[in-house]
């Protein structure tokens, strides 16, 4: 009997060293599969926590307002009456929200006092004056100190026209800006900022600008100085008003305020506060309320919060597959190791080692390996995964940087789950052996006789090779291992199809929009000094038709919410958007309609600059990247400014590239793009998402390699006596290897084919938690992607199997055929 614990520990430690030396490859497979599953899960959790941290840091640093109240006219009593009548209002501040025209998407400029504390900007560099978002500077290739031009409604027109003698002070040959419907400002960028309302990338939506009233006043004064005799005009204003022109403009700017920001004492009671605000405005003689909403209904907040939520869901999609496969691999590996050590367990029991120590020993082997692999995965995951996905987030969002959080309770829970599975597997597998008597475990386990003996005269028996017969026999004999291989390759195949399917879905959406929804050959934007060049375009060689499509950044308002979205106005008999000819009236994409909770027949309010329209929805269409409203231009006012794009269609005998060359030589355009150019640009935007799909494919291949390597190694170890027998009987290496390869490939083919069935559901799950405001997913997987997914799985399995078949040469015939009896 072993009396001292030290002696028992020494025996078990030596046994552990022997086991490590003999089965080190199986142990590495446990470490790798634990590492892969934990690495992917911990990395995605870290990515989700990092994105949420970036958003929350921005919100707290900017002191994000709880409620936004937008009015159509300024009433100075509101800012006094609202907090006095509504107890829940802690802080209220006023500002001016001013959409302006700039290129295609426009800019939403906030004019706010520097003393305001709600939803204020974070200054990155430069100084206060006009602050721009970093993504805007990057996309427009601008820097601090540069200037750019904007166009906006002439808010001075109605406020200063009462001073008719101003016209007498107009400079010779200059423009009387007070009579113009639009005015232009040249804005100098003084600083770069972060702001919670401007987090969306300006390449895909309106950017945000932030300026002080003093800066806007300076812009107006410069505009007046450029067009009027300033000194005489200032004297005239002083004579009639008793104040300087500068003071007059300051008072006028104050009356332009159209928005109140509110911080509630208790954000949980925002619904009640909103109701009281609406009741206050309804009780007024002149109700000037346009919209009162919580910050949660702002488009910028909704879109970012959607991405944060989706990032939090992503770790629970395909990493679960790795977790389940990991559990199966660990179970199989530990089972095989313990079964191979039946005789050693019998010896340990025979010399008096307590059962408790044997349990701890075999449970501890798997636990230690799983713990090591999982800890390594918890470290590597946050290092590898977040930087890859950050490429996507930086494309979409303008957020402050932050450090990557490493350890999280979710990853720790994953680690504990892995350890529990390993401990439970080790206990129950070792229990089946430990409960046997020592004398029984010292003998080889008796194989169960084959119940069904094939008929040697049957067609199957005569026309089937020996390798295939043995492979099929081994498959039916080792059902547990067969299930492991099938499940492992099923996971690999479904992940591979998912990786290809994501890109198929994106490409299909783009192809659908540019071929089914719109008809585009060449698009061109005219130079700023060439507003009406349609007739000139017709004189260019090869041009058959020219269509002008005007785009606007508009506010779309339904009964429940509002968003900023583009509006595209088309000519009659449109070639660019052919559906408008069959469905004349307002056409809106499904994503925009869903945001506003609208259906066909509902009415929508459209605010473009200072013009308001109420339209009935005639058609809702499926789209991927086309978002907004499409309508005929004849249904709208002619005096609203727009950004116009010329869609040019060539004659049949000229290619798009040749027509583009002719258009470039005309010097009428600032930019020209063909259909191929747009496709190239779209794929460049998708490159960040393609990087994510490559990660999925790589993990799928790694999963397949680990599973096949582990189970193939176990298979060869189990078949040692069979391999030695075949060698004795004179079978060559090729014949023996083909038996093992066929056995593995039959399982891999079954698993690969089953995995194809799960490819589409997995693609749907992954993309459903990655919805963005840029595009709507039109789920689609091409047939050849299924083929590629199957080939990736089958090819990986075949390569690993052929590599491991070299072990057959190391099997020694005499030693392998020895029996303990």
Residue ranges and their predicted role:
Residues 1-39, 363, 367, 451-491, ...:
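N-terminal Sec/SRP start-transfer signal
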Residues 2, 435-452, 806-821:
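Short cytosolic juxtamembrane segments of multi-pass membrane proteins
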Residues 2-327, 336, 395, 509-522, ...:
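Membrane transport/envelope proteins' first extracytoplasmic loop
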Residues 23, 328-368, 704-747:
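Interfacial "coupling" helices/loops that link adjacent transmembrane helices in transporter permeases
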Residues 69, 466-594, 599-602, 606-612, ...:
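Juxtamembrane segments of multi-pass membrane proteins
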Residues 327, 331-336, 341-343, 367-399, ...:
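Small-residue-rich transmembrane alpha-helices
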Residues 354-355, 437, 599, 732, ...:
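Short coil/turn motifs that cap or connect alpha-helices
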Residues 645-647, 662-768, 772, 776-781, ...:
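C-terminal transmembrane helical bundles of large multi-pass transporters
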């Amino acid at each position: 009997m072993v009396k001292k614990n030290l002696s028992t520990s020494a025996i078990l430690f030596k046994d552990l060293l022997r086991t490590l030396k003999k089965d080190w490859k199986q142990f590495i497979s446990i470490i790798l599969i634990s590492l892969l599953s934990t690495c992917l899960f911990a990395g995605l959790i870290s990515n989700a926590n990092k994105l949420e941290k970036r958003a929350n840091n921005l919100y707290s640093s900017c002191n994000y307002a709880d409620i936004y109240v937008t009015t159509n006219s300024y009433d100075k009593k509101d800012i006094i009456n609202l907090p006095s009548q509504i107890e829940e209002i802690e802080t209220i501040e006023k500002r001016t929200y001013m959409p302006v025209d700039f290129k295609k998407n426009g800019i939403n400029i906030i004019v706010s006092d520097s003393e305001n504390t709600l939803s204020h900007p974070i200054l990155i560099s430069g100084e206060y004056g006009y602050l721009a978002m970093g993504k805007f500077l990057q996309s427009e290739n601008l820097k601090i100190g540069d200037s750019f031009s904007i166009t906006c409604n002439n808010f001075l027109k109605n406020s200063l026209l009462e001073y008719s003698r101003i016209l007498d002070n107009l400079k010779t040959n200059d423009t009387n800006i007070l009579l113009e419907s639009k005015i232009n400002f040249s804005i100098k960028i003084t600083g770069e900022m972060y702001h919670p309302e401007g987090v969306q990338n300006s390449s895909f939506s309106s950017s945000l600008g932030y300026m002080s009233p003093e800066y806007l006043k300076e812009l107006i004064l410069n505009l007046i100085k450029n067009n009027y005799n300033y000194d005489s005009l200032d004297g005239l204003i002083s004579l009639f008003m008793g104040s300087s022109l500068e003071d007059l403009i300051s008072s006028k700017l104050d009356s332009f305020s159209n928005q109140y920001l509110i911080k509630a004492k208790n954000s949980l009671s925002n619904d009640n506060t909103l109701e009281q605000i609406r009741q206050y405005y309804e009780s007024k003689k002149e109700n000037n309320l346009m919209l009162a909403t919580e910050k949660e209904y702002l488009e910028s907040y909704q879109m970012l919060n959607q991405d944060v939520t989706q990032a939090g869901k992503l770790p629970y999609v395909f990493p679960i597959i790795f977790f389940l496969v990991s559990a199966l691999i660990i179970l199989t590996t530990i089972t095989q190791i313990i079964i191979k050590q039946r005789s050693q367990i019998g010896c340990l029991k025979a010399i008096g080692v307590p059962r408790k120590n044997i349990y701890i020993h075999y449970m501890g082997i798997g636990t230690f390996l799983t713990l090591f692999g999982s800890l390594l995965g918890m470290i590597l995951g946050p290092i590898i995964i977040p930087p890859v996905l950050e490429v996507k987030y930086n494309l979409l969002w303008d957020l402050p940087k932050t450090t990557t959080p490493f350890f999280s309770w979710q990853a720790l829970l994953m680690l504990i789950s892995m350890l529990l599975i390993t401990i439970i597997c080790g206990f129950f597998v070792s229990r089946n052996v430990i409960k046997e008597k020592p004398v029984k475990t010292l003998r080889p386990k008796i194989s169960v006789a084959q119940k069904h003996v094939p008929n040697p005269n049957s067609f199957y028996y005569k026309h089937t090779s020996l390798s295939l017969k043995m492979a099929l026999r081994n498959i039916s004999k080792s059902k547990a291992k067969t299930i492991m291989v099938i499940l492992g390759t099923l996971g690999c195949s479904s992940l591979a199809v998912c990786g290809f399917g994501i890109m198929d879905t994106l490409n299909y959406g783009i192809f659908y929009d540019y071929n089914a929804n719109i008809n585009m050959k060449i698009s061109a934007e005219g130079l700023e000094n060439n507003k009406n060049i349609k007739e000139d375009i017709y004189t260019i060689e090869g041009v058959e038709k020219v269509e002008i499509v005007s785009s606007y950044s508009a506010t779309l308002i339904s009964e429940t919410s509002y968003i900023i979205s583009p509006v595209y106005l088309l000519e009659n008999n449109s070639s660019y958007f052919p559906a408008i000819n069959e469905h004349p009236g307002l056409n809106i994409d499904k994503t925009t309609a869903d945001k506003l909770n609208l259906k066909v027949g509902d009415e929508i309010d459209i605010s473009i600059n200072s013009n308001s329209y109420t339209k009935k929805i005639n058609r809702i269409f499926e789209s991927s990247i086309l978002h907004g409203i499409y309508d005929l231009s004849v249904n709208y006012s002619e005096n609203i400014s727009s950004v116009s794009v010329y869609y040019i269609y060539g004659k049949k005998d000229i290619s798009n590239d040749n027509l583009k060359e002719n258009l470039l030589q005309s010097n009428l355009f600032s930019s020209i793009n063909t259909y191929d150019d747009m496709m190239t640009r779209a794929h460049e935007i998708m490159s960040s998402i393609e990087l994510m799909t490559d990660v999925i494919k790589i993990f799928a291949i790694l999963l397949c390699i680990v599973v096949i390597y582990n189970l193939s190694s176990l298979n060869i170890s189990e078949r040692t006596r069979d391999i030695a027998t075949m060698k004795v009987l004179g079978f060559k290496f090729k014949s023996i290897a083909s038996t093992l390869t066929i056995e593995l490939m039959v399982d891999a083919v079954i698993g690969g084919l089953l995995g194809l069935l799960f490819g589409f559901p997995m693609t749907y799950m992954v993309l459903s938690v990655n919805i963005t405001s840029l595009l709507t997913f039109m789920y689609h997987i091409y047939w050849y992607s299924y083929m590629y997914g199957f080939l990736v799985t089958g090819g990986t399995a075949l390569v690993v199997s052929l590599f491991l078949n070299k072990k057959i040469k190391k099997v020694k015939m005499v030693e392998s055929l020895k029996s303990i009896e």
